[in-house]
Structures are given as structure tokens and as C-alpha cells.
Amino acid sequence: MAAVHARIASIFLVFASIMQPASSESGAGVSDALPSALNIAPLAMPDFSFAGYGFGLAPIPTESGKVIDVTHHGVISNDGKDDAKAILKALAAADLVRGLVTIRFPKGRIQIGEIIPVERSDIILDGAGEKDGGTEFYFPRPLKIVDTSDRENELRDYLKREEKFQVEPDQNISFLFSEYSWSGGFILIGPKKSRAASYLAEYDKQDTVLTQAVSGRQFDRQLIVANISRLRVGQIIQLQWSANAGENSSILKSLYGDISGWNEKQTDPKMKLNIGLRHWESAKRPTVAQSTRIIAIKGNTVTLGDPLLHAVSAVQPALLAAWKHLSNVGIQNIRFTFPYSPWFGHHLEQGYNAIYMTGIFDGWARNLVIENADSGILTDNAASLTIANITTTGNHKAHYSVHIGAVHNVLVRDLRIENPVIHPLSVNTRSTRSVYQRATVLCDGIIDQHSGSNHQNLFDQIVMNVKPKKRDDVWSYALWVGGGAPYWKPGHGRMNTHWNIRLNFDADAAKGTTVRVTSGLEGPGAWIVGLHGNRSLEVDYKPDAYVEGTNAAIAAAPSLYDYQLAKRRKRP
């Protein structure tokens, strides 16, 4: 394993220096060749095409099942009165229905003044369209005012104990973080009384162990287990790897590779990579979790719905655990509107959050417009979601647009970000093999790799409008601006991939020159393939990354997700 990591490091260094083609100062060319990144051994690039509903292959359901019309339960659009109680009555009626049920909303403005929990499987919230003349959900007050539940108590305790204060002396800001900065939503989807995210060790409970995993190769779908008596075909389980040996655990080496080579070269201690203690400090909390479906069982060999994130062996153990979740839950064809409100500062959001998707396997959100939110869609503790055709808009500065949190196999497709957002595209703590595909960021585009063992994520065919800065006659743009606390560093694990990203610079900025595209200290093992724009670009990524095809759009495979999905569909 050490030899493999060493070879990986050397390959990254070689290609970082030789694989950037010369280009004209006018910007991008076009490459008709497939990038070499697709064929480099032993670096088997993850197959990202398993992200999304039905492991990327199954279409989102179009059937409605039993339809419940909310107007039959008291919803009256456009009357200026609150409709939350009537919606809750409709949901109570849905709970009496076995099988698929659709909650149907009429055209017009529907006012909602409290949290709407969606706590069952096989349910769709369906409006009459997200455009003008369709269905509009209007939320006049933030969660800070309307949420009187205890759902966020663990997070509130965590913020106080960790002394999570936003401190900006020049703005006279020294305030405790808001619990709604990255959590909570008015449409709250998840199992009843479930824990959306873990913060404090005393809240941790050992998940029910179904069996121990014995062996399996990374990126294979077959896994040998110790006992199959509690397993069945079609079962949703969570495969868990833990760093039980602390900072020397094998799973951390699989996550981050050998970082010693980078660290030995650094004279500035701030530029050294350190693995934070959150990776191993809770014995009941996995370091890496993969929620998946059992497709087949033969003897003690289990076939999973998607490839193993990491190998399983005696030195890198894993277990199969039960996982509380909903399935087949969707929300679609609706516009969400919040009143314009002042921006009080980073981490001080008041909770104008539209949707929080948690504890879901096979779910979706599609055809939504979200205006003036603090966060449009937040996700945690979920897997196999498709979030498609979302537009976030408005003049209010947001924290997140569509956030990829502690989730696995989430596909965010055709996202359009029109509003100012602190973290417009963000893979957060514990996000794995998730994808932003064809997102368009209209202002201040950045990529946030938010620490917390996020790894094997894909930014695919993204278009970003950006404004470079000039200093000492050098133009530069900070594209990779990762957040996260020191105890969750590095910024990301191996194989976060940036594919065919286009940067559009202001018409008069950096004209006739090369722009240096920079990062902070991110994480090891990144892939940056086909970064291009309307200026000549030079990549400066820290630590060393695999960089190929800069200044040339990838014509042969514009979308890596689509390319890999097409190859899967051709397999017997």
C-alpha cells in the first residue's frame, strides 16, 4: 500500500508539470482527445455515474399514486392567510394511505409560517410549476422566530461548547454562530425523531451492527462478509469504516494517501497538511460511511449497488450497519419565496432555509426556484438523491445555494445560481462520491471543499463568472476557497475531481495576459482536468494535484458523469 501511495504522489508531480498545453492569450482551445486521466494506472478514477436516484440509471418516477389535494384540507392560495395548518392536515391524511401518495398544491401563493415535516416514505410534494403563474410557497418569517422545537438542541450545545463565534473586529461582530447557518429547513424531510447530523459524542449511539465486512477491493462491488443471516437482497445498509487506531489508522491512509512528501518540502508550518482529531475521536461514529443497497447475495459474498469507496481487509476493517431512512420522497414544480432581508454576516443567518433533506435513500428535488434564501437546499445523512433544475435567485446574500453535506451519491444537475452566495458549490463534511454537474454560477464563483473527510466528489462541466484581482502586475483568481475547522482538516481527501470547468472573466479584466488560478491549502490527490476560460490560465493548487489539459475544453467527454454513465449502460 505504501508503494502504491508513493507512486501516486510521483504521478501527480509529473503530470502537474507536463500536462498543461500551451495556449493563446485569448483563452481556451478545444481538445478532441480523451484526457489521459481516464487511463492512468494504478489510479483508477472513481466511477461517479452511480450518483443520483437509482444509482444514476433509474428514471425519477412519474406516477402519482393516491393524490391528495391540499385545497380539500383548507389551503386557499392568494388569500394572504397562513396555510401551514391546512398543509399539515393534508400530510396527516397522507399518513393513512398505504403506498405512493402525492400532495398536490394549486397555483398561486401559499403562505407557510411554520416547519412542515415530511416523515414518511413514498410521498411527493407536487406543485403546478415553478415559473410565474405556478405554485409559490411564501415564508414571511425565518426559522429563528418560528422554530420552537428541540430539533437543533445538539447543534446549539455544540456551538456553545466549541465557542463557535463569528469574529470580525472591523465590523464590530463577535456573535455565536446561528444554528440555522447549515442546518434546518421549512420543508424538513427525514424520519421522525432522527438525528440529521452528529456533533457531540454524548449523543452518539452505536448503530445496529448487521455483520462484519471481511474483504473487498476498492471500487469493486463485491464484498465478503462474516455472516449473512441478517442480510437480504434489496436491503439498504450502511457500510462503515472507522479510524479505530487513531491517526495511524489504515482508513486515513486510504483517504489521504502519503502526505509526508508534501510536508517535508514545506518551510512554513502553516502549509503542512495535518489530519484533524475529529476523524477518530468518537468510537461510535464512523470516519467514512457508504449507504447503499444489497443487490445480490451468494454464499458470503454480497454484491452492492455501487462500488466500494475503500478497500476492506483485516488492517482496514469495516462493518455493515442498519440505517434509519425514508425512500422514494420527492418535491417538485414549486417556487420558494422569502422576503428580502439584510445580510447580518457569515454564520449569522436567521434561517430562511427552504428545504432540508435528511435520512433519505432514493429521493429527489427538481424544477424549483428559490428566492432570497439563506440556504436553498441543505442535505445530510442521505444517499442516492437527484437534485435537478434548481435556480436560486434574489438579492439577499446566501450561505449555501444547494449544499452537499454528509451524503453519498448525490447528483446536483443543472443548478443555476443567480444570487450572491458565500459557498456557491460546496462539498461538506463526510460528503462522498457526489456530483455537481453543469452548474452555472453567475457571480463570484468559487469551489468550497469544506474539510471533514469529504472525498471522491466531482465538479463536472461547471461554468462560473469570476472577477480576478491584480497585484504586483500579476492577475490571479482564488477559485478553490475551502472552509471547515482545523479539527476536520485537510480540506478534502483523495480523488476530488474538477472536470472541464470554464471560467468567464469580466470583459476588461486581465485582457491579453495569463490569470493564475489559485487555491488555499486544500487537500491531497485532487484531479484538475480541462480547466479553461476566456483568458489563458495557469493552475496553482496546493498541495500537489494532478493537472491536465489546462486551457482546452474537453470535447471528447464534456461531462465526466455522462461519459462514465454511457460506458455503464453499454456493459452487459
Predicted stretch roles:
Residues 104, 111, 117, 126, ...:
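Extracellular beta-strand solenoid repeats
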Residues 1-9:
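Bacterial N-terminal signal peptides that target proteins for export
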Residues 286-291, 296, 302-317, 321-332, ...:
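Beta-propeller domains
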Residues 10, 20-106, 111-344, 520-572:
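Extracellular "leader-to-stem" segments immediately downstream of a signal peptide or signal-anchor
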Residues 122, 327-338, 361-372, 383-396, ...:
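Right-handed parallel beta-helix
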Residues 439, 460-572:
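Catalytic domains of carbohydrate-active enzymes that cleave complex glycans
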Residues 115-119, 135-146, 178-180, 185-192, ...:
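Glycine-rich beta-solenoid repeat tracts in large extracellular/virion proteins
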Residues 8-16:
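Sec-dependent N-terminal signal peptides
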